[in-house]
Amino acid sequence: MQVSVEATQGLERRLTISVPAEQIEKLVKDSLQREAKRARIPGFRPGKVPVTVINKRYGAAIRQDITGEVMQRNFIEAIIAEKLNPAGAPTFVPGATDGEKFEFVATFEIYPEVELKGLDAIEVEQPKASVTDADVDSMIETLRKQHATFAAVEREAADGDKVKMNFVGSVDGVEFEGGKADDFELQLGSGRMIPGFEAGILGHKAGEEFVIDVTFPEEYHAENLKGKAAKFAITLTEVLAANLPEVNDEFAALFGISEGGLEALKTEIRKNMNRELEQALKANVKEQVINGLLANNDIELPKALIDGEVNVLRQQAMQRFGGQTANMPELPAELFTEQAARRVKIGLLLGEVIKTNELKAEDERVQALIASMASAYEDPSEVVAYYNSNKELMQNMRNVALEEQAVEALLKSAKVTEKEVAFEEFMNKATGRA
């Protein structure tokens, strides 16, 4: 086997590989003979079909298969010999056979050489927060509102009430599509409607008819309504006030607390809040570390890896439609290219961090991650056992643990400052409610 390597552009490499033609001819001959022994062709006894007949019928297909196998095998031997690390499958172009040698070209991309830079320039503001008694009480109040019952009242509508109404919206005196509804139910203070809509209902009673003036936000989804002034003619048909359940042992029973009553509920709430806080704190720091790593390290990315990640993201997006994708057009790659490139870059950089620091997934950390995740389920021990018995899930958890360890390694050289934050403020930002 003779090999020449050419760097064409960027990470692309072109291998020209020559192998003795007799190697292919021998393999083709052997394959034809094997086929002749097992072929069943009318007019010939089993095992007695002439090779010339087999060659006429199947020779082209057999030669094509053998050629593919020879190219694949010799390509692997060549990249091992040349110490090349392909980032994707090669494209093979077979050449002509001159009787003495068979030559083919393999084109592919290699992984970039990654040299980590600017690790000591990564800046991280590490938030410090804890769950207080007031936070637990606030969560209980939220749960009370979620379990509220509503009853009709004859007073003016107030924040927190539910209202039922009929309305018609218009712009410049003309009704617009989607601006009309009957028996529409809305909880005041929910923020479901455009600015000014809910505020315009406050202070009105059931049976009243009135008009409110609002302006659609510039970022509104309907192009024809962006920034437009509108009027809504409203008929308020019902005002319903919330009746909140009392906070007692019966309230605790609503959440499956059979023993310990209210105090047991508070303990469970605090445990869940602490778990969510810990996850959010980790995610916040990780995002800052990753962003700093990306900003300080520019590397060339193999197109093959980006294309592969685009396909993964596209499949995930299609699955979110509930599998109803048979008649849907394929989502364009451009929708996912930026996110795919980011994920590939993160993977390559963290891979180098793991390699440089000789990191291996710590078993204790893996089990701690599984236990933390399982604690959100009714029977944590069953979930832990399921994970430990599933190789694919365990590998996923090892990858998560290894990523955590890589982030911690980067934190050691980063510029870290701590900042005290309130639980509610931090969690609102973390969940996008700020």
From Swiss-Prot:
<dbReference type="GO" id="GO:0044183">
    <property type="term" value="F:protein folding chaperone"/>
</dbReference>
<comment type="similarity">
    <text>Belongs to the FKBP-type PPIase family. Tig subfamily.</text>
</comment>
<keyword id="KW-0132">Cell division</keyword>
<dbReference type="GO" id="GO:0043022">
    <property type="term" value="F:ribosome binding"/>
</dbReference>
<dbReference type="GO" id="GO:0051301">
    <property type="term" value="P:cell division"/>
</dbReference>
<dbReference type="GO" id="GO:0015031">
    <property type="term" value="P:protein transport"/>
</dbReference>
<keyword id="KW-0963">Cytoplasm</keyword>
<dbReference type="GO" id="GO:0051083">
    <property type="term" value="P:'de novo' cotranslational protein folding"/>
</dbReference>
<dbReference type="GO" id="GO:0003755">
    <property type="term" value="F:peptidyl-prolyl cis-trans isomerase activity"/>
</dbReference>
<keyword id="KW-0413">Isomerase</keyword>
<keyword id="KW-0697">Rotamase</keyword>
<dbReference type="GO" id="GO:0005737">
    <property type="term" value="C:cytoplasm"/>
</dbReference>
<dbReference type="Pfam" id="PF00254">
    <property type="entry name" value="FKBP_C"/>
</dbReference>
<keyword id="KW-0143">Chaperone</keyword>
<dbReference type="GO" id="GO:0043335">
    <property type="term" value="P:protein unfolding"/>
</dbReference>
<dbReference type="InterPro" id="IPR008881">
    <property type="entry name" value="Trigger_fac_ribosome-bd_bac"/>
</dbReference>
<dbReference type="InterPro" id="IPR008880">
    <property type="entry name" value="Trigger_fac_C"/>
</dbReference>
<dbReference type="InterPro" id="IPR037041">
    <property type="entry name" value="Trigger_fac_C_sf"/>
</dbReference>
<dbReference type="GO" id="GO:0061077">
    <property type="term" value="P:chaperone-mediated protein folding"/>
</dbReference>
<dbReference type="InterPro" id="IPR036611">
    <property type="entry name" value="Trigger_fac_ribosome-bd_sf"/>
</dbReference>
<comment type="function">
    <text>Involved in protein export. Acts as a chaperone by maintaining the newly synthesized protein in an open conformation. Functions as a peptidyl-prolyl cis-trans isomerase.</text>
</comment>
<dbReference type="Pfam" id="PF05697">
    <property type="entry name" value="Trigger_N"/>
</dbReference>
<dbReference type="Pfam" id="PF05698">
    <property type="entry name" value="Trigger_C"/>
</dbReference>
<dbReference type="InterPro" id="IPR005215">
    <property type="entry name" value="Trig_fac"/>
</dbReference>
<protein>
    <recommendedName>
        <fullName>Trigger factor</fullName>
        <ecNumber>5.2.1.8</ecNumber>
    </recommendedName>
</protein>
<keyword id="KW-0131">Cell cycle</keyword>
<dbReference type="InterPro" id="IPR027304">
    <property type="entry name" value="Trigger_fact/SurA_dom_sf"/>
</dbReference>
<dbReference type="InterPro" id="IPR046357">
    <property type="entry name" value="PPIase_dom_sf"/>
</dbReference>
<dbReference type="InterPro" id="IPR001179">
    <property type="entry name" value="PPIase_FKBP_dom"/>
</dbReference>
<feature type="domain" description="PPIase FKBP-type">
    <location>
        <begin position="160"/>
        <end position="245"/>
    </location>
</feature>
